[in-house]
């Protein structure tokens, strides 16, 4: 029973910590550094996420083709064709994301 009496005190303490940490976070985000850090994090997440999605799609496509078709394509394509496709699609995705980065950088312009 004494344990139950300490729960409101524990909840009050955790609430105080949460509000304090949230306040520090908001003061940090009000500064320009917070905005830049969030933009860079989102940019890196876009690059990594889009690249992993494209590689996943390519591996799913190659797994769902009929075996006769796969054997016929393997006679024509070199052994390193799939990694080359990965690189080409990754570069295309990176170019798209760098265009998005330019928009983010123009949003983070210091003169605004």
UniProtKB/Swiss-Prot annotation:
- BP term (GO), one: symbiont entry into host cell
What are its GO cellular component terms? host cell membrane; membrane; virion component
Location in the cell: Virion; Host membrane
Question: What topology does it adopt in the membrane?
Answer: Multi-pass membrane protein
Principal place of residence: virion
Q: Which UniProt keywords apply?
A: Host membrane, Membrane, Transmembrane, Transmembrane helix, Viral penetration into host cytoplasm, Viral penetration into host cytoplasm via pilus retraction, Virion, Virus entry into host cell
Q: Per the UniProt record, which residue ranges are transmembrane?
A: 3-23, 36-56, 80-100
**Keyword DNA-binding included in the entry's annotation:** no
Instruction: Describe, as the record does, how this protein assembles with itself and its partners.
Output: Interacts with G3P; this interaction is required for proper integration of G3P and G6P into the virion.
- Sequence similarity: Belongs to the inovirus G6P protein family.
Q: What is this protein called?
A: Head virion protein G6P
């Amino acid at each position: 029973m004494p344990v139950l009496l300490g729960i409101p005190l524990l909840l009050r303490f955790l609430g105080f910590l949460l509000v304090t940490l949230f306040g520090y976070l908001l003061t940090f985000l009000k500064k320009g550094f917070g905005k830049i850090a969030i933009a860079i994090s989102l940019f890196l997440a876009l690059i990594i996420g889009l690249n992993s999605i494209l590689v996943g799609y390519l591996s799913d496509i190659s797994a769902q083709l009929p075996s006769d078709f796969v054997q016929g394509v393997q006679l024509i394509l070199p052994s390193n064709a799939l990694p080359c496709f990965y690189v080409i699609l990754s570069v295309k995705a990176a170019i798209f994301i760098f265009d998005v980065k330019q928009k983010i950088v123009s949003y983070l312009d210091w003169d605004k």
